Amino acid sequence: MTKIGVQASTVVDAFKEIGPYETFKKLNEIGYKSVEVSQVETSEENIDQIIRACKDFDMEVAAMSAAVEPMFPGQESLDTDFDKIVADCKAVGTDLLRIGMLPFDKMASLEKAIEFAKKANKFAIKLKEEGIKLYYHNHHVEFVRYDGKYLLDIIAENAPELGFELDVHWVQRGGENPVNILKKYAGKVELVHLKDYEVMPLTMEDLGFLQTDMEAFRLAFDNRVRFAPLGQGSLPLKECADQAIASGCRYLLVEQDSSYGRDPFKELKISYDWLVENGYGDLF
């Protein structure tokens, strides 16, 4: 059965300021019971707090996160910390592990992206022996075409053991229909990120650039898309959620990459209310 949860990175500042235990408590008070852990330091203390929070608030960890190789000095990765990452997954009780993004140096080279996919596939096979499934989270760059093929499809071809965590906002930003991509990868998608796609109106300040700085106006005009709580934008979210469920998704995870100065917990409450109002309340 599909469950609805939340992506920890949405409230990453809270994890740093009040710790995992109190952050899980606040998420639970909204109504979220499943949390995908990402951008949270996996220190022994934090892992212990997560375990305790899950027990005290009847919550669960939907998935953990890992890089294939370090993207910055000191970052844990499957390359350098395989045993610890496996141990952390088992400690918090999840069998799902996800790669958050394509490393930056792989984004400008098809050859390097293919090397990454093959390396991820080897780790997917190795993790499978530990009872853990590995997934890859997309952004818009996976919809660059190489000889007519999306990079996402090329990654899939070179990493058959790697599942996908499809992000409906980033699929839309990449120029594709999220419903179609969810349908295309049915059976390969057990994690889905839900966030809305909001186009913001121009401001009077933006219009003022018409008289003083045309380049600044064009920059403002071309960059109107923002992340938004569910129901606040233009994505066909009900169709996305229904197709994700039909495609075998285990967790629909609410995420908002930025709250633009607003309280992210209030943003998550807006998304929670939209999901309940649209018939998904029994999935929490």
Go through the PLM ranges and name each one.
Residues 232-245:
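A short, acidic, amphipathic alpha-helical segment used as a generic capping/interface helix at domain edges
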Residues 8, 39, 68, 101, ...:
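Residues that line or immediately flank small-molecule/substrate-binding pockets and catalytic motifs
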Residues 36, 63, 98, 135, ...:
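Conserved beta-strand positions in the central sheet of alpha/beta enzyme cores
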Residues 12-18, 34-48, 68-80, 104-108, ...:
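Acidic-and-aromatic substrate-binding clefts and catalytic sites of carbohydrate-active enzymes
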Residues 74-164, 173, 184, 265-266:
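Active-site acidic/histidine proton-transfer and metal-coordination neighborhood
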Residues 127-228, 234:
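Acidic/histidine-rich catalytic cores of soluble enzymes
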Residues 251-279:
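C-terminal/domain-terminus segments
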Residues 1-95, 132, 163, 273-284:
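N-terminal pre-domain/capping segments
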